[in-house]
């Protein structure tokens, strides 16, 4: 792409278990602006660095000033081994790949948390009767290739993201069917986290397990096929998605309690926008609120689905600003 000058431009990325998204960031205005956000399939590249180099070559840009890349996995000593892929990436290898002056990795849901307070109404789909008030702490969570979670602490005008690995907390069954689901998964894995169900691979397992429990034969389908068939009205797949939405509601409510997210819960990730109508129609909100003695607490918390696919890129751009750097330092 001609006409771009590397001065004042940065690269932001969002790399998960399936997709790698990149954009350039222009800091000329009051807020950072994304330029040419682009998504690639991770399986098309040998390494994360290959994908980054391909994007920069496509944009015709050499040596942007800085990079912030949001990654799906815990970061230790400036490096990540992705939880749901074989890729590895470090801040040093990122810096070398793009010729950046500075390069930083942040957790993908930390990026989601940085973006959440800045999302416009068009970026969100309200689930339930309440709208966000702009006050109170937030929880940001959601299923994709894995399950991510983060918090946003807001005090006296200062926003501080809380990085977590909340997708790996234990799955807590709600009824007899979910107890049977848990038994199957414990036999298979020894321990069952919410990510074992609330993810693309988890949805595929859930579909087969529900068929076994209910004594009906089901085809082994991908998560994409299950969601598409459910939205189209397929009864078998709709049962799976309804259960998926219910379990997601329970997990979201648990994380809202754990993070004290009275300001709102944002459901992000690649799956929720594709099933948003079923989330709204099903038991998601009822299960979110069903917290026994704390049900009044969760009943007062707004829930929204994040519909903008570039939210983590927005959050990575925020991390480049002085306030963002201070928040995650």
Curated annotation (Swiss-Prot):
Catalyzed chemical reaction(s): D-glucose + ATP = D-glucose 6-phosphate + ADP + H(+)
SUPFAM superfamilies: Actin-like ATPase domain
Primary location group: cytoplasm
InterPro entries per the UniProt record, alphabetical: ATPase_NBD (IPR043129), Bacterial_glucokinase (IPR050201), Glucokinase (IPR003836)
Molecular function terms from GO: ATP binding; D-glucose binding; glucokinase activity
UniProt GO BP: glycolytic process
Keywords: ATP-binding, Cytoplasm, Glycolysis, Kinase, Nucleotide-binding, Transferase
A GO cellular-component term linked to this record: cytosol
Compartments it resides in: Cytoplasm
Residues at which ATP binds: 13-18
Pfam families: Glucokinase
E.C. designation(s): 2.7.1.2
Protein family: Belongs to the bacterial glucokinase family.
HAMAP family listed in its UniProt record: Glucokinase
Protein name as catalogued: Glucokinase
Encoding gene, per UniProt annotation: glk
């Amino acid at each position: 792409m001609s006409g771009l000058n590397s001065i004042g431009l940065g690269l932001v990325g969002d790399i998960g278990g399936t997709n790698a998204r990149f954009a350039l960031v222009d800091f000329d205005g009051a807020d950072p602006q994304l330029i040419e956000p682009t998504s690639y399939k991770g399986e098309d590249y040998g390494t994360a660095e290959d994908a980054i180099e391909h994007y920069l070559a496509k944009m015709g840009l050499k040596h942007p000033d800085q990079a912030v890349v949001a990654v799906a996995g815990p970061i230790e000593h400036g490096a990540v081994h992705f939880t749901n892929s074989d890729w590895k990436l470090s801040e040093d290898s990122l810096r070398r790949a793009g010729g950046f002056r500075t390069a930083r990795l942040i957790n993908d849901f930390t990026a989601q948390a940085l973006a959440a307070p800045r999302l416009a109404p068009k970026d969100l789909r309200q689930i339930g009767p309440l709208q966000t008030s702009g006050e109170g702490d937030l929880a940001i969570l959601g299923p994709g290739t894995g399950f991510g979670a983060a918090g946003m602490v807001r005090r006296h005008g200062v926003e501080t993201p809380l990085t977590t690995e909340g997708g790996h907390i234990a799955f807590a069954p709600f009824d007899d069917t979910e107890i049977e689901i848990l038994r199957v998964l414990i036999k298979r894995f020894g321990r069952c986290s919410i990510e074992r169900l609330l993810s693309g691979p988890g949805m595929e397992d859930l579909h087969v397990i529900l068929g076994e429990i209910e004594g009906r034969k089901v085809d082994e389908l991908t998560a994409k096929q299950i969601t598409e068939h459910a939205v189209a009205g397929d009864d078998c797949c709709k049962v799976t998605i309804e259960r998926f939405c219910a379990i997601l509601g329970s997990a979201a409510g648990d994380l809202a309690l754990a993070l004290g997210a009275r300001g709102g819960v944002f459901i992000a990730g690649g799956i929720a926008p594709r099933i948003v109508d079923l989330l709204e129609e099903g038991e998601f909100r009822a299960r979110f609120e069903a917290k026994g003695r704390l049900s009044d607490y969760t009943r007062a918390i707004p829930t929204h689905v994040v519909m903008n696919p570039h939210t983590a890129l927005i959050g990575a751009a925020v991390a480049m600003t002085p306030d963002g750097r201070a928040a995650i330092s």
